[in-house]
Amino acid sequence: MVLLILKFHGESVKIKPECAICIIRQVVDAANEITDDEREQFRLIKSTMEVIKDVYGESAVPAWMGTVVHRYLKKISNNNDPYKNLKEKANKIALQYLDKVREMSNTDDELERLRKKVLATIAGNVIDFGAYSTGINIEKLIEDTLNGELKIDNSRKLLNDLKDKNIKKILYICDNAGEIIFDRVLMEEIKKYDKDIVAVVKGKPILNDATLEDAKIAKIDEIAKVITTGSDIIGIILEECSEEFLKEFESADLIIAKGMGNYESLTEYEDKIDKPIYYILKAKCKPVAENIGVDVGDNVLLKR
């Protein structure tokens, strides 16, 4: 078996023992999305666990390990997009709440408005749209997030950077389907500062990450140039990205990266990146939370 071999450069989020639980859960979830046949689910899970044994170790990066595992699962299942139905449902539900999120995140105070737009994008990540039925009060979950706090709050720094005339182009690296609908809310705010936005989605399906199809549904192309990584890797691994992405990555004046996968992978390159990076995420697991210096469940807007 040929595995993904990458040379990383800096200190970042490494695998912890408890990461095994998460990756196995993801495999089980994916198998359930692929087929209802329990016998086939067992086959997919057992086979993929052999790959996990090869890549699971204390020096691995979670996003890298997840990429190897999910690529293998797609291959043996002959299913290039196991989460397709879940992504479609997530987008559909998120669109129903887009106008409400715009309204709830609007205020006259410039700094507070930016903070709420950031929280709006986190709300898209907090709420697993595909997992909720009509019995769940999604609007309340969104409202609670918008009225919540950023444990690390670099909103003032972001506002100052948006006002900086020397910062012209922003590379906005998206995370999940559904969530990308709410990313539009923050992008609309950024455009008020006369910035060019280059939105990045995955080149091929992986997990429930946003692709070009999801960007079109969110109408991101109306306010930003949309490109792909050219790959299906989780997070950003520069060695696998397209020339188009690398060109935009190099020429951007500022980067906004959504979600834990992008944090896990981009922190590997921080000593090589000569521009500000803002990470927007909810710390959903202990390894990421400890690396950032927050508690599990905290919302973060972090400038590096």
From Swiss-Prot:
Protein origin, superkingdom: Archaea
Pfam families attached to this UniProt entry: ARMT1-like_dom
SUPFAM superfamilies: AF1104-like
Disulphide-bonded residues: none
UniProt-recorded name of the protein: Uncharacterized protein MJ0202
Organism: Methanocaldococcus jannaschii (strain ATCC 43067 / DSM 2661 / JAL-1 / JCM 10045 / NBRC 100440) (Methanococcus jannaschii)
